[in-house]
Amino acid sequence: MAKAKRTKSLEISQLVKKKVYERDGGCCVWCGKPGKPNAHFIARSQSGLGIEENILTLCWDCHMRYDQTTNRRKMRDYFKSYLKLKYPGWDEEKLVYNKWNVER
């Protein structure tokens, strides 16, 4: 059975993972340990797209901390600044799946 368009849009392709890994030097952007490029800035559950501008390299511990603890706000603020530095014109609203391409 084919995947829904939304589901495909939220997945992180191997090409995106490779680009993000290179962008982040293979290290967790929070603590500097070796990491994997599989963390969504805007979560998949919130329709966050699997695009470079929404993906971060994090180690396992920091990924869990970002997803499941009260540190999320502090981490999110840092990640937002980090992504803005990497992508001039970075816009959080462009990171969310929008079936109808309607401006929010």
Where do the protein language model's features map onto the residues?
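A boundary/linker detector
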Residues: 1-23, 31-35, 72-104
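Histidine-centered nuclease catalytic patch
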Residues: 27-57, 66, 70
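Short microdomains enriched in Cys/His and/or Lys/Arg
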Residues: 45-62, 80-94
